[in-house]
UniProtKB/Swiss-Prot annotation:
Gene3D superfamilies on file: Ribosomal protein L39e (1.10.1620.10)
GO molecular function: structural constituent of ribosome
CC annotations in GO: ribonucleoprotein complex; ribosome
Xref: PROSITE patterns: RIBOSOMAL_L39E
Entry similarity comment: Belongs to the eukaryotic ribosomal protein eL39 family.
Domain of life from the UniProt record: Archaea
Species this protein is from: Methanoculleus marisnigri (strain ATCC 35101 / DSM 1498 / JR1)
Keyword Ribonucleoprotein found: yes
Protein's name according to its UniProt entry: Large ribosomal subunit protein eL39
Keywords associated with the record: Ribonucleoprotein, Ribosomal protein
Lineage: Archaea, Methanobacteriati, Methanobacteriota, Stenosarchaea group, Methanomicrobia
InterPro entries (UniProt xref): Ribosomal_eL39 (IPR000077), Ribosomal_eL39_CS (IPR020083), Ribosomal_eL39_dom_sf (IPR023626)
One Pfam entry name: Ribosomal_L39
């Protein structure tokens, strides 16, 4: 794997990790004040600048 591809793979993995829902315990702790997060990304609707 080249250096360029490795960097891209790491950035894609980071984007994949960030694209998760808010944990259930956070919703319970905040009485559903925090129910969703605005940086949620759909793979079809928006493109990544990786």
């Amino acid at each position: 794997m080249s250096k360029l591809m490795k960097g891209r793979k790491i950035r894609l993995a980071k984007a994949c990790e960030q694209n998760r829902r808010v944990p259930a315990w956070v919703m319970i702790k905040t009485n559903r004040a925090v129910a969703s997060h605005p940086k949620r990304r759909n793979w079809r609707r928006s493109s990544l600048k990786v």
